Regions:
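C-terminal charged interaction modules
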Residues: 92-96, 111, 118
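…primarily DNA-binding HTH/wHTH and HhH modules…
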Residues: 130-153
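Short Lys/Arg-enriched helix C-cap and helix-to-coil transition segments
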Residues: 119-126
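Pre-recognition alpha-helix immediately N-terminal to the DNA-recognition helix
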Residues: 76-80, 107, 144
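Active-site and channel-lining beta-strand-loop segments
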Residues: 14, 126-128
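A short acidic, helix-capping loop that chelates divalent metal ions and anchors anionic groups
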Residues: 34, 128-131
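Basic nucleic-acid-binding alpha-helical/helix-turn surface characteristic of O6-alkylguanine DNA
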Residues: 1-102, 152-153
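Regulatory, non-catalytic segments
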Residues: 103-117
Length: 153
Protein backbone atom coordinates (compact mmCIF):
# COMPACT_ATOMS: atom_id res chain seq x y z
CA UNK A 1 0.00 0.00 0.00
CA UNK A 2 1.18 3.52 -0.77
CA UNK A 3 0.77 6.46 1.56
CA UNK A 4 1.12 10.13 0.74
CA UNK A 5 1.09 13.44 2.53
CA UNK A 6 1.22 17.02 1.31
CA UNK A 7 3.91 19.30 2.71
CA UNK A 8 3.98 23.06 2.33
CA UNK A 9 6.52 25.56 3.67
CA UNK A 10 8.18 28.73 2.39
CA UNK A 11 5.86 28.73 -0.63
CA UNK A 12 7.01 25.24 -1.61
CA UNK A 13 4.46 22.43 -2.03
CA UNK A 14 5.72 18.85 -1.97
CA UNK A 15 4.20 15.38 -1.87
CA UNK A 16 5.85 12.79 0.38
CA UNK A 17 5.19 9.16 -0.61
CA UNK A 18 5.83 6.08 1.52
CA UNK A 19 5.45 2.34 0.97
CA UNK A 20 4.74 1.90 4.68
CA UNK A 21 8.37 1.13 5.44
CA UNK A 22 10.29 4.04 3.91
CA UNK A 23 9.93 7.22 1.89
CA UNK A 24 9.98 6.32 -1.80
CA UNK A 25 9.35 9.75 -3.34
CA UNK A 26 9.35 13.43 -2.52
CA UNK A 27 8.27 15.54 -5.46
CA UNK A 28 7.01 19.04 -6.10
CA UNK A 29 3.24 19.36 -6.28
CA UNK A 30 0.24 18.36 -4.22
CA UNK A 31 -2.30 15.57 -4.09
CA UNK A 32 -6.02 15.97 -3.39
CA UNK A 33 -6.18 12.59 -1.65
CA UNK A 34 -3.80 12.34 1.26
CA UNK A 35 -3.29 9.07 3.12
CA UNK A 36 -0.46 9.75 5.57
CA UNK A 37 1.36 7.19 7.68
CA UNK A 38 3.96 7.50 10.43
CA UNK A 39 6.77 7.59 7.84
CA UNK A 40 5.31 10.49 5.81
CA UNK A 41 4.45 12.35 9.01
CA UNK A 42 8.01 11.96 10.33
CA UNK A 43 9.43 13.08 6.98
CA UNK A 44 7.10 16.09 6.94
CA UNK A 45 8.27 17.13 10.40
CA UNK A 46 11.92 16.81 9.43
CA UNK A 47 11.37 18.77 6.21
CA UNK A 48 9.75 21.56 8.23
CA UNK A 49 12.81 21.67 10.49
CA UNK A 50 15.05 21.80 7.40
CA UNK A 51 13.11 24.70 5.88
CA UNK A 52 13.21 26.44 9.28
CA UNK A 53 17.03 26.03 9.22
CA UNK A 54 16.97 23.77 12.30
CA UNK A 55 17.98 20.49 10.60
CA UNK A 56 20.98 19.63 8.43
CA UNK A 57 20.33 15.95 7.77
CA UNK A 58 17.43 13.53 7.62
CA UNK A 59 17.04 10.24 9.44
CA UNK A 60 13.70 8.96 8.17
CA UNK A 61 14.05 5.74 6.15
CA UNK A 62 14.52 6.03 2.37
CA UNK A 63 13.99 3.41 -0.34
CA UNK A 64 15.54 4.33 -3.69
CA UNK A 65 15.61 0.93 -5.36
CA UNK A 66 11.83 0.67 -5.80
CA UNK A 67 11.67 3.81 -7.97
CA UNK A 68 10.29 3.11 -11.44
CA UNK A 69 13.38 4.73 -12.96
CA UNK A 70 15.95 2.95 -10.79
CA UNK A 71 18.87 1.40 -12.67
CA UNK A 72 22.17 0.23 -11.21
CA UNK A 73 23.86 3.40 -12.52
CA UNK A 74 21.18 5.73 -11.18
CA UNK A 75 21.23 3.99 -7.81
CA UNK A 76 25.00 4.51 -7.64
CA UNK A 77 24.56 8.21 -8.40
CA UNK A 78 21.66 8.63 -5.95
CA UNK A 79 23.65 6.92 -3.20
CA UNK A 80 26.60 9.24 -3.94
CA UNK A 81 24.26 12.24 -3.63
CA UNK A 82 23.53 11.19 -0.05
CA UNK A 83 27.23 11.68 0.74
CA UNK A 84 27.32 15.36 -0.24
CA UNK A 85 27.42 17.26 3.07
CA UNK A 86 24.95 20.00 4.01
CA UNK A 87 26.24 23.38 2.88
CA UNK A 88 28.57 21.98 0.21
CA UNK A 89 28.30 21.40 -3.52
CA UNK A 90 29.95 19.22 -6.14
CA UNK A 91 29.95 19.64 -9.89
CA UNK A 92 28.41 17.13 -12.25
CA UNK A 93 31.94 16.24 -13.38
CA UNK A 94 33.15 15.68 -9.81
CA UNK A 95 30.15 13.48 -9.09
CA UNK A 96 30.79 11.53 -12.30
CA UNK A 97 34.36 10.85 -11.18
CA UNK A 98 33.15 9.84 -7.71
CA UNK A 99 30.87 7.16 -9.17
CA UNK A 100 33.51 5.86 -11.58
CA UNK A 101 32.15 7.51 -14.70
CA UNK A 102 35.00 9.88 -15.59
CA UNK A 103 33.88 12.20 -18.38
CA UNK A 104 30.26 11.23 -17.78
CA UNK A 105 28.92 14.52 -16.46
CA UNK A 106 25.92 14.40 -18.82
CA UNK A 107 25.02 10.84 -17.83
CA UNK A 108 25.31 11.80 -14.17
CA UNK A 109 23.16 14.86 -14.85
CA UNK A 110 20.45 12.59 -16.23
CA UNK A 111 20.58 10.40 -13.14
CA UNK A 112 20.54 13.43 -10.84
CA UNK A 113 17.49 14.76 -12.69
CA UNK A 114 15.69 11.45 -12.19
CA UNK A 115 16.21 11.47 -8.40
CA UNK A 116 12.83 10.46 -6.91
CA UNK A 117 13.42 11.84 -3.40
CA UNK A 118 14.00 15.60 -3.54
CA UNK A 119 15.84 17.35 -0.70
CA UNK A 120 16.53 14.23 1.41
CA UNK A 121 18.63 12.89 -1.48
CA UNK A 122 20.29 16.26 -2.08
CA UNK A 123 20.44 16.63 -5.85
CA UNK A 124 20.19 20.40 -5.31
CA UNK A 125 23.84 20.31 -4.14
CA UNK A 126 25.07 19.40 -7.63
CA UNK A 127 26.01 22.39 -9.78
CA UNK A 128 27.60 22.99 -13.15
CA UNK A 129 31.25 24.04 -13.15
CA UNK A 130 30.40 27.64 -14.08
CA UNK A 131 26.79 28.15 -12.98
CA UNK A 132 23.99 26.81 -10.79
CA UNK A 133 23.09 24.03 -13.25
CA UNK A 134 19.61 22.62 -13.68
CA UNK A 135 17.01 21.20 -11.33
CA UNK A 136 14.08 18.97 -12.22
CA UNK A 137 11.84 20.68 -9.65
CA UNK A 138 12.64 24.20 -10.89
CA UNK A 139 15.54 26.58 -10.44
CA UNK A 140 13.50 28.69 -8.01
CA UNK A 141 13.42 25.75 -5.58
CA UNK A 142 17.11 24.96 -6.14
CA UNK A 143 18.03 28.56 -5.33
CA UNK A 144 15.89 28.46 -2.18
CA UNK A 145 17.49 25.20 -0.99
CA UNK A 146 20.99 26.54 -1.62
CA UNK A 147 20.10 29.73 0.27
CA UNK A 148 18.77 27.69 3.22
CA UNK A 149 22.14 25.91 3.34
CA UNK A 150 24.01 29.22 2.88
CA UNK A 151 25.62 28.00 -0.32
CA UNK A 152 26.89 30.76 -2.61
CA UNK A 153 26.20 30.15 -6.28
Amino acid sequence: MMYCENFSNAGVSLVIVSNGKAVTEIFRGSTPEELPDSITTEASGQLKEYFDKCRKSFDFPLELSCSAGATPFRLRVWEALCGIPYGETVTYGELASAVGCVGGARAVGGAVGANPILIAVPCHRVVAKDNIGGFSAGLDLKRLLLEIERIKY
